[in-house]
A protein has these predicted regions:
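Catalytic metal-binding/acid-base residues of hydrolase active sites
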Residues: 55
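Structured mid-to-C-terminal alpha-helical surface segments
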Residues: 1-48, 58-66, 70-281
Length: 281
């Protein structure tokens, strides 16, 4: 559906007042939707599996979790620079009648935070004279236990539903927990702590404990990091008492309004509960 600048600004202003989410975050989400609409009608739709913060934002609500990029697991397609750029440009060029232009800007290898690699593709979204930069992160390889799930994505500013594949909750939790344990006090990804906390608070009744156990084992084996219960709790204890980690949490909370007044100890207490479930005989 086509939209003009005035209508977009009005809708974003109204939604910002309703949700308390900053207008810049909502504008970015609008351009994310522009990409997703194009992806959904492309021949590559089944090759992209939703994961990461954007998936959580759409499931939990943007007022509980905002993000700066969209994360995908790529399957049945080569994760090679030339191939990925070609695919992404083709997707962005599709016409969905929304009055939005997506221009390819850059391609970067991801190494800073993801030791397992991947690529970041950057587009500039434009509607009339409104511009916003969006990032699409793509990785491959990690196992999904038992498999990806059908996911119906609802666009932010309209009632359009897009069909995709997505991670299940158990695999999301398993990957975040593995990252927390693997990085210990060297972890600057405080979003993993918050994500486990908010999933536990809002959607834990949907978690299958046996699938979660298998997902954690599969993720750890794939990433060559095997933990027993004692090791896992020792790592978590060192994190809980580390001044730098507590300082990181304060900074993360101050930068992300959706975190509210959640304390770092509340997140680590939740992680203890999750570890108890995983290591329960």
């Amino acid at each position: 559906m086509a939209i003009n600048k005035s209508s977009l600004q009005s809708r974003i202003n109204n939604l910002s007042k309703k949700t308390g989410v900053h207008q810049n975050i909502l504008l970015r989400s609008f351009f994310f939707d522009a990409f997703l609409k194009r992806l959904s009608i492309s021949k590559y739709a089944s090759n992209f599996v939703f994961k990461g913060g954007f998936l959580l934002s759409t499931i939990l609500g943007i007022n509980f979790r905002a993000t700066n990029d969209i994360d995908f697991l790529l399957k049945n397609t080569a994760l090679e620079e030339e191939n990925i750029i070609s695919i992404m440009k083709e997707i962005a060029s599709l016409n969905v009648g929304d009055n939005v232009d997506l221009s390819y800007k850059d391609f970067q290898e991801i190494r800073e935070e993801d030791e397992y690699g991947g690529y970041k593709i950057i587009f500039e979204g434009r509607l009339e004279n409104i511009k916003e930069t969006i990032s699409i992160d793509i990785a491959t390889g990690d196992p999904i236990t038992p498999s990806d799930v059908d996911y119906k994505y609802k666009c932010l500013l309209e009632n359009q539903i897009l069909d995709f594949k997505a991670y299940n909750f158990e695999t999301i939790i398993a990957e975040k927990l593995q990252t927390i344990l693997a990085r210990g006090i060297l972890n600057s990804r405080l979003k993993d702590y918050y994500d486990l906390y908010i999933i536990h608070k809002l959607r834990w009744n949907e978690i299958n404990s046996e699938i979660l156990k298998r997902a954690f084992i599969n993720t750890c084996e794939y990433r060559n990091t095997i933990y027993n219960k004692e090791e896992a709790f020792q790592i978590l204890e060192s994190v809980m008492t580390d001044n730098k980690m507590n300082s990181f949490w304060t900074n993360y909370k101050n930068k992300n309004k959706f975190v509210g007044d959640v304390k770092f100890k509340e997140t680590t207490d939740v992680i203890k509960l999750v570890l108890d479930i995983i290591f329960k005989n």
